[in-house]
């Protein structure tokens, strides 16, 4: 016999946060690449049979915009309505603090992960998250340097993903 529960679609909504670095060091072309990849991810997520709740956070050293996405038409409209906000320095910790506030308030109840599209220049959080965290970079995995010559160090607890011209959405 097949249990009734085996026929039910799960009601749990998967939640994903996509952060897009709009700081001054991210040139317009790079931000457009972030948008293209974000669009590809969102369309892929929506193709699953279950509901999704995605938040796109545009940020530099502060939260510039927080856009909730729950429907296919919103996914297609997002790049059309995008305009760069911010353009200051990057502090990744701002997004992580903001996500914690959303979780504590109940706005994010089942966070599966956070993808942060960035050039890598900025202040990283020291404390590991209890959800999967991926920093997405364009180019190869050659260690990047700050303007003062220091190697940029992504926290060990975060996944580093490098997208080349061949792997872009």
Predicted region positions:
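…and closely analogous acidic/polar surface helices at protein-protein or active-site interfaces
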Residues: 14, 24-57, 130
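Von Willebrand factor
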Residues: 63-68, 74-123, 137-153, 164-167
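Short, structured coil segments at secondary-structure junctions
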Residues: 129-131, 156
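Hydrophobic, well-ordered secondary-structure elements that form the walls
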Residues: 21, 34, 119
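Short, conserved, surface-exposed binding loops centered on an aromatic residue
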Residues: 4-12, 44-49, 71-74, 106
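Structural motif
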Residues: 15-17, 55, 110-115
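Short, T/G/N/S-enriched strand-turn elements that build extracellular solenoid repeat scaffolds
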Residues: 124-128
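Acidic, polar low-complexity linker/tail segments
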Residues: 1-17, 24-29
């Amino acid at each position: 016999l097949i249990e009734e529960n085996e026929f039910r679609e799960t009601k749990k909504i998967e939640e994903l946060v996509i952060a897009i670095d709009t700081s001054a060091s991210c040139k317009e072309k790079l931000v457009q690449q972030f948008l293209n990849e974000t669009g590809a991810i969102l369309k892929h997520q929506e193709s699953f049979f279950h509901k999704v709740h995605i938040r796109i956070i545009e940020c530099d050293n502060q939260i510039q915009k927080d856009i909730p996405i729950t429907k296919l038409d919103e996914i297609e409209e997002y790049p059309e309505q995008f305009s760069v906000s911010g353009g200051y320095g990057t502090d990744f910790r701002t997004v992580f603090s903001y996500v914690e506030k959303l979780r504590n308030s109940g706005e994010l109840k089942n966070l599966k992960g956070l993808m942060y599209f960035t050039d890598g220049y900025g202040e990283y959080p020291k404390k590991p998250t209890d959800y999967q965290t991926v920093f997405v970079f364009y180019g190869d995995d050659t260690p990047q340097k700050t303007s003062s010559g220091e190697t940029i160090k992504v926290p060990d607890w975060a996944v580093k993903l490098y997208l080349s011209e061949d792997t872009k959405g």
